[in-house]
A protein has these predicted regions:
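Hydrophobic/aromatic-rich core segments of domains that either
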Residues: 1-48, 123-124, 312-315, 321-325, ...
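Short, ordered, surface-exposed loop/turn motifs in non-cytosolic proteins
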Residues: 71, 79-98, 119-120, 413-443, ...
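Secondary-structure boundary elements
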Residues: 86, 190-350, 360
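Short, acidic Ser/Thr/Gly-rich low-complexity loop/linker segments typical of extracellular
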Residues: 95-116, 432-458
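Short Pro-Gly-centered beta-turn/loop motif in secreted/extracellular proteins
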Residues: 112-123, 128-130, 137-141, 444-481, ...
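Short active-site neighborhood of thiol/selenol oxidoreductases, capturing the structured segment around
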Residues: 531-555, 559, 572-575
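Short, internal strand/loop/helix patches
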Residues: 587-624
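Thiol-/selenol-based redox modules, centered on thioredoxin-like
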Residues: 623-658
Length: 658
């Protein structure tokens, strides 16, 4: 959040405000940002770079508000060295296993685009028609990059890059002790108000009691009620009002929607999706693609009754007539620049919408008719399942897209079981641009990674024929990503075998400092301090954390997401709250299960923090979490303060070394 004060834009800490402006939990990590963008409603006439303008707003480059920047230029040329006008230039950052486009610009008559960026590395992908090219722009070393469109869609190519983020610079305390004390009192007051409300949420025990009353699975129901947080009363009303013979159906509905849906969906919406007749519950796709009300990322609404009336009014009795009627809906994408999905009821009432909303409507209508349907995870196009086949729909003619198979072969041990949307992704190359396909997302995990390689590729995966890219990456402890890209083709009716390479991170095991080995904490459930047991061989982690703070929450989500990996390693890890107040505020049920090797405790009178800070010469001890990896001699080889991407993986990379 930014505010205009004294003639300039300044930022504040969003839902965790600090004593002064331009201080937030992200003040340190945002120095490592390559690009920061703000979306402004309407036209914007400020001094910052405008990266796009549409009917609803403007995209503003605000990177310079947060970190050191450099103006850069990308020139696109053809194979003859001539500038290419109107080439599409995508600036990409490796994030969640893919080269993600953060900005898209189009070249001018000189073949150039300009953009102000942070002082790190960024991947640039340029295309026009069937021609494409790419390269790495290392902003700290160069301010200009030339990209040659020397490749054609269908060519086979590969490349590897070490993408280094901007350097983080140490900063002194930005607020005084007095200001911090006043702000902490505000936080305490806010926490007390919040905790009074949170205390009204249904507990796991209470959920189990209600489950026994309703005659449903105790553990499942209790888990849903705890996950629903402040929305528990709506779920409770839903389960009490649904007909007893449909409670199993109702439980399956709660199990198939995302955790966030449990927290904000009204009972009436849930009830609407278990009403009606003719449910083919024996269909193997029933729960996921018929009962499930979610099609994409739209708000869940009660649409089935309105869709039934639409089907009846237009005498639609099969999928063919539904395709014909849906094709009559007027599509005007230009009216929907915000790309917010119009609910199916809104599409029916207006008779005009955008492509995505029309496709969502079609899938919702199919599911209402009892026909399994989805937006293809591969192409994003609407599909329905009939006679053992998924059929792709284009609303003019029914089309069965030729398909082939892909098998990724991974024999390395760089990463024991690579995760989709973390270590690798697959994207389809269409008209020069890459569209990442969803082979294993995990909507139930907040900012979590997807399914693992061993889960996805137990057998070959079916894909549409065409050109594809495999992106892989491994993040070092300094934030740099060892990224690779390889293209391949999938041919109709054939099996394509591709070897997946994830380059190992060779960490520089420098001794960053030496801390006392006689470190102690007050273990969870105890009142007296006990010594931290450092490993005889290798390294362990000590993390000083705060409760209900975003940087700590990110770290804890990383740890729960890697539960099996850390348990297989078997090394004790110490997670220590800065004081007893923070330990008291922490609610473990807000997170998924943690690795059993995590040892919880409290820092007694700040002694642990003081010992670590003195040994490491830390000038700023306010930025938490503080993660230290050390051996039995107290030699520290890794230090991290505040928010950092992929901390769980970085901890694993170091302590798993033999």
């Amino acid at each position: 959040i930014e505010v205009w004060v004294d003639g300039e834009w300044k930022y504040l800490g969003a839902c965790e405000p600090e004593p002064r402006l331009n201080i937030a939990w992200f003040t340190l990590p945002v120095q490592r940002a390559m690009y920061v963008e703000s979306e402004v409603f309407g036209k914007y006439n400020g001094q910052e770079e405008i990266v796009y303008v549409n009917e609803s707003g403007s995209g503003v480059n605000v990177t310079s508000h947060y970190t050191r920047t450099v103006p850069t230029v990308v020139q696109v040329i053809d194979e003859n060295g001539q500038p290419v006008e109107n080439a599409k230039v995508e600036y990409k950052i490796f994030n969640y296993g893919e080269f993600y486009p953060v900005v898209t610009l189009y070249s001018d008559v000189k073949g150039e685009t300009s953009l102000t960026l942070g002082q790190g590395d960024i991947f640039v992908w340029a295309s026009k028609g069937k021609k494409l090219g790419f390269g790495e722009l290392s902003v700290e070393r160069q301010d200009t990059l030339t990209v040659v469109l020397d490749k054609t869609v269908g060519d086979l190519f590969s490349g590897e890059w070490d993408l280094v983020p901007p350097r983080q610079h140490d900063i002194t305390a930005l607020s005084t002790d007095e200001e911090r004390a006043v702000n902490d009192r505000r936080f305490a007051r806010e926490d007390s108000l919040r905790n009074v409300y949170v205390a009204t949420f249904m507990s796991r025990t209470q959920g189990g009691d209600v489950a026994m009353e309703l005659g449903v699975d105790t553990a499942r129901f209790a888990a849903y009620m705890v996950a629903s947080r402040g929305n528990y009363s709506e779920l409770l009303r839903f389960m009490r009002e649904v007909l007893p013979e449909r409670r199993t159906l109702a439980m399956n509905l709660l199990g198939v929607i995302a955790e966030k849906d449990l927290q904000d969906t009204p009972a009436d919406v849930l009830l609407s999706h278990v009403e009606g007749d003719g449910r083919d519950v024996a269909n193997p796709y029933f729960t996921e693609y018929i009962l499930n009300p979610r099609v994409q990322n739209e708000l869940l609404t009660a649409y089935r009754e309105a869709v039934r009336e639409f089907l009846k009014r237009h005498d639609i009795t099969d999928v063919t007539s539904l395709i014909q009627e849906t094709g009559k809906i007027k599509v005007v994408d230009s009216l929907y620049p915000a790309k917010v999905v119009t609910p199916p009821v809104g599409v029916i009432r207006a008779g005009v919408t955008d492509v995505l909303s029309r496709n969502v409507f079609f899938v919702a209508a199919c599911r209402t008719m009892g026909i399994p349907a989805r937006l293809s995870p591969i192409s994003g196009k609407p599909e329905y399942y009939q006679n053992g086949t998924w059929h792709t729909v284009n609303f003019m003619t029914e089309k069965v897209v030729p398909k082939g198979e892909l098998m990724l072969n991974y024999a390395q041990k760089t990463v024991s079981d690579p995760k989709y949307f973390l270590n690798f992704t697959i994207g389809k190359l269409e008209d020069g641009r890459v569209r990442t396909i969803d082979l294993g997302s995990n909507a139930a995990v907040d900012m979590g990674v997807g399914a693992s390689y061993k889960t996805i590729f137990t057998k070959p995966v079916t894909l549409e024929e065409g050109d594809y890219l495999l992106s892989t990456g491994n993040r070092r402890s300094d934030g740099a990503v060892l990224a690779d890209l390889v293209s391949f083709q999938v041919e109709a009716g054939k099996l394509t075998n591709i070897d997946m390479l994830i380059r190992p991170c060779v960490e520089k095991m420098e001794i960053l400092g030496v801390v006392p080995t006689a470190l102690s904490i007050v273990p969870e459930g105890k009142t007296k301090p006990e010594a931290i047991r450092l490993p005889e061989k290798g390294y362990t982690a000590i993390a000083l954390i705060e409760a209900n703070k975003e940087p700590t929450n990110h770290l804890l989500r990383d740890m729960s997401g890697m539960k099996d990996d850390f348990e297989n390693l078997g090394v004790p890890l110490y997670f220590v709250f800065k004081d007893a107040d923070h330990q008291a505020k922490f609610n473990r049920e807000d997170f998924r299960a943690f690795p059993s090797v995590m040892r919880w405790g409290t820092d007694l009178d700040g002694r642990l923090l003081k010992g670590l800070a003195e040994g490491l010469c830390l000038t700023n001890t306010e930025s938490l979490p503080l993660i230290v990896l050390l051996n039995a001699k107290g030699e520290v080889v890794f230090v991290s303060q505040g928010y950092r991407v992929g901390l769980g993986t970085q901890i694993m990379n170091i302590i798993s070394r033999k």
